[in-house]
Amino acid sequence: GLGGRLDSTNEIPCPVLSVVTGIDYDHMAILGDTLPKIAAEKAGIIKPGTTVLFGEGAPEAEAVIRETTDRICGAQAYHRTDYSRIALAETSLDGTAFTFAPFGKLRLSMCGMYQLRNAANVLTAVELLRDKGYKIPDDAVRDGLASAKWKARFEVLSRDPIIVYDGAHNPQGIAASEANIRQYLAPLTPDGKVHLLMGVLADKDYRTMIAALAPYAKSVVTITPPS
């Protein structure tokens, strides 16, 4: 989905909670070529009576989400995820252990610092829903996070040899992919480099993607997907 005004979920007339996890350059031919334009499209999920949660993004993008919320729902409806509440315990290809006050010890089956931030968005959303009267048990939250899977997001396909598949396709995603290679894969090789198999659609910023990943490449094989 495109996430916002043109997304299929926008058929919901009055969502209880609208969450904008982050805003970056993506689907620019449809959403616009600046962050404020993209944010304006994302803001299409904000409806009267909705509580709005914003994760992260450039100040000019957040300003659009906040202003739209203020205009449609009132200033009291706007909330922002506080990532400083995250405390990392340990992380590996097997998953991530962390705490997020006041939920206590939690675990993700996924790795990557961005998945911690996604989890923080989820936990903040749970708090906002509880404020609205929804009964969401702590055990359900813990079990949900521990069992959550996200295909093609630094997904470990094989252990011997280690093969990881990542569908990152915008600058924000590639930055996360680069950080994951540096943290999880580079330490497992003598020279800190890995073999890359890479294919990029024509409308993506492939130059930025290649520049970010090239320092970790022992070899590169490219494919050309239909686009």
Give, region by region, the residue ranges found by the protein language model.
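Nucleotide phosphate-binding/pyrophosphate-handling subdomain across enzymes
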Residues: L6-V19, I23-D24, K37, T99-S219
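Active-site glycine- and acidic-residue-rich loops that bind
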Residues: G1-G3, P59, V200-A202
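Glycine/threonine-rich flexible loop motifs
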Residues: G3-T9, A29-G32
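Acidic, Mg2+-coordinating active-site environments of NTP-dependent enzymes
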Residues: P15, V20-P102, A119, L123-D139
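Short hydrophobic segments within beta-strands
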Residues: G55, L197-G199, I223
